[in-house]
């Protein structure tokens, strides 16, 4: 099933504007993208929103005072969304497993979609993305360098892909 909508940011998390943290902060960017759904539905996100998410994901990463890739337990439990709005992060469950060529991402993810959450973080081969949802649609946010089809490219941008079914989601490293 094809992607219904593509939004691209101005750059990606590995951009030199992020300095020494460039390329390290995908987990924080993904976390911030889930929090950002509380103030703006991903169906209305535009280029500026993706840039805002990258900038704030980088800001969160820099507050952790590390220069390494993060795992979920390393993430903060509170996020400053705007100057006065703090969001509590609730990691309902951590599930670990293996994906192989026979794995169906939609069926694996579908078991974790519920009406009391608005997104999840997916860590595959060391790369973190977020899967977001509304009542009707599913979205894949990726802070890495992607082209307008969601494929890896050295000169790409962060991306938000929209699907009408979780089974349509494909995750490419």
Model regions and ranges:
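Cysteine-dependent deubiquitinase/ubiquitin-like isopeptidase catalytic cores across multiple families
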Residues: 1-173
